[in-house]
Amino acid sequence: MIRKTFNYYFKTYLILLSLLAVYYLLQKYNNLVEWTISEWLINYQGGFTRRGFIGEIIYQISNIISLSIREIILLFQISACFFYYYLIFNFFKKIKMNFIFIFAIFSPLFLVYPVAEVEVLARKEIFLFISFILIANIFSLKKNTNIHYFYFSSILTFCILIWEGIIFYIPYFIFIILIKNKFNYNKKFIIRIILSLIPFCLVLYFIINIRLTSQDIVTMCNSVNECYGAMTYLNNDLHSNIGEVTSQFKIIYLIRYMLIFVVGFTALIIIINYSHLITKNKNQNKKLLFLFVLALIPSLFFYVIAQDWGRWINISYTLSLLTYFYCLKNNFIIFQNPKIKNKSLRNKNVLIILFIIFCFGWNQKTLMKDDVGSLPIYRKIYSVIKNTI
C-alpha cells in the first residue's frame, strides 16, 4: 500500500515537473540570448570540438526537415526531459518505501532543482543522468555478457561527445559495475573494463587536444546564424576558467555551499550509514560510505574550474542517490531502519511538516555567489499563473 501510494504521488510530482519544464523551455526558446540554447547550438561545422555532437545532429536534421534549429532544439529538450522523468519513475517504482527514502528522493538537490533554477533546465548533464540510468538498468540484468559492456562503452562515448564533464563522474559508473561483479577483480573483468573505456579515452584525448581557431568558431556560428554564450567559450583554457572562479571567490560562498551540501545530503547520508554491503567479508560492511565519498571526490575539481556550484551539487547528489538505489534494488546492500527514540519524530504530522519544509522550502541557486532560494515549486507555479492570466 505504501509503495502504491508513493507511486501515485511521485507520478503526480513528475507530471507537474514535466509541465513546468515545458512551460519554461518555451520561454527559453523565445529568449534570443539564452545560455542553454547556445550550448545546444555547438556543432562540428567549424571542425571537431567538445560538446558538438548533439548540435551536429540537430544541424543535420534541420537540413532535412522544414523546422528551424531552435525548434528542433526545443523538441530535443522536451523529449530529453520527458524521457528522463520516465526513466526516473520506472527506476523507483518497485522500491519498498519508508519515510527516510522519501526524504532523500524529494531532496531539493534532486529533481526539483532544474525547474527551480530554469537556467539549468535541459542543460547537457541531463544526458549524463539518462546515460547513468540506462547503464544501471543494463547492469541490473542477472547476467552481463560482452554485448552489455559494448552498450556501456557506447553510451559513455556518446555521452562524452555531448558533455565532457562526465569525466569527473566516471567513478559512479565504475562503482555500479564493480559492485555488480562483487568487487571481484579477475583478469576477465579488468580486460572488459579496459576495452570498454578505450573509445571513451580516445574521444577525451581529442577533446583535450583539438581546439577551434577563431575562424573555425566563426564558421560554426555562421552555420546556425547565432554566436553567443557557450559558443564563445569554446576556446577558453583551464587557466582562464579557474581565474573566473578565484577572482570572485569568497569564504562565505564556500561556507554556504558546505551547509547546502550537508543539509541536502542529510537523508542520503543517514540511509548509507544504516546500510551495509551484502558480502561474506565483514570488513567491507564499513566501506560503503567510504566508497560513495571516493566516487564523489573527483567531481570536487569542478568547483575550482566553474562557478555553477549549484549544478555540481545537483549532479553529485543525483548520481549518489541513483547509485544507492541501484545497489538496493539489486540486493547488493541491505538497509536497516534506524530506531527513532524521539517521540516527536515518530509523529506523522511532525514528519509531514518536516517533509514540506525540507523538500519544498528551499533550493540551491546556480552560481557560487548566489544566495539560497526559497519555496521553489510555489514560486514557479505562481509565476506561471501570473504570466498566463
Regions found by a protein language model. Name each.
Residues 148-175, 300:
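Membrane-interface alpha helices of multi-pass inner-membrane proteins
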Residues 147-150, 193-198, 333-362:
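Signature aromatic-anchored transmembrane alpha helix within multi-pass, membrane-resident enzymes
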Residues 127-144, 148-156, 173:
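Specific aromatic-rich, kink-prone transmembrane helix
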Residues 52, 102-130:
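Aromatic- and kink-enriched transmembrane "portal" helix at the membrane-lumen/periplasm boundary
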Residues 113-124, 269-328:
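Membrane-water interface signatures at transmembrane helix termini and the short loops
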Residues 170-197:
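Perimembrane helix-loop-helix junctions
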Residues 75-98, 134-138, 272-274:
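Transmembrane-helix motifs of polytopic, lipid-linked glycan transferases
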Residues 19-29, 191-272:
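Membrane-lumen/periplasm interface segments of specific transmembrane helices
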